[in-house]
């Protein structure tokens, strides 16, 4: 499934930096500081692992970006840098924070506001602040989230492929369910299925009563006939994530399992129907929660019931801006992407979660995947 995958173009990345500069101007930010991570990849296409050594980019409101790299990594950095040629190295005994402060000075930023990308680690931020104390340091989420929350058609196409891959991997893994299987064996099978399709993916899976734990149990499990199987998996395509959960029964479902599964599906449908342009994020959560409460569960986050938000944003990170949760008055706009995953948790018995991701269009929400038709048919 690797054929036909189109990476994000350099022109699109330049457009992202231009949008960041416009948002910086609106928020009176003179430069943006980012370290290695998904936002750096978003703007530049650079993939770089985090360590104690700083690799960073400064994106000024005016002018090309500047990069800070360990001296011995300069050649590797140059392999990936495609925007701007201001590459500054620091040797092992030198201060990278002083190098960043030098960029601010050289770009004429002696006073003003520096936006810190929200995932920057404290020791990096603190080091920069001490070297350039005359500057004000502010949260740059208005810039980064302002860019990343709205996906382009190219991004949505990559997310579509990631979802297609995970569904196929799920199908292959479910075909191998067997009595006595452990979660570790299921995880290995699912990883191998993703790999066979050309991508790296992983899964969380729980059986029976342990399916009630939203993020799983650490206790030993072995699959038995009649067990609920709750599996939550995803993969990345050019960095863009899928996130899908399916719940089925190994064997013949009981009336109770079928009843709870059907309530969960109605809650997922209610959230999807509510996810219209201009609706608030909290109204989507409320729609799903009402179905579960009306069925006699909850209320609020009480269990048996729905113990967590209805969904989260998704893109380059499996969880990103913004959440479908009570109190979030952000309005849905075309290009936003979310998971739709209310859950019905009944500790001591089982849990059911159905998760499909959706993207918002002018005409309403669209699912990346076909929803589960029934507890007997996990794949549409």
Identify the meaning behind each predicted range.
Residues 1-380:
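Active-site neighborhoods and metal-handling regions in enzymes and metal-associated proteins
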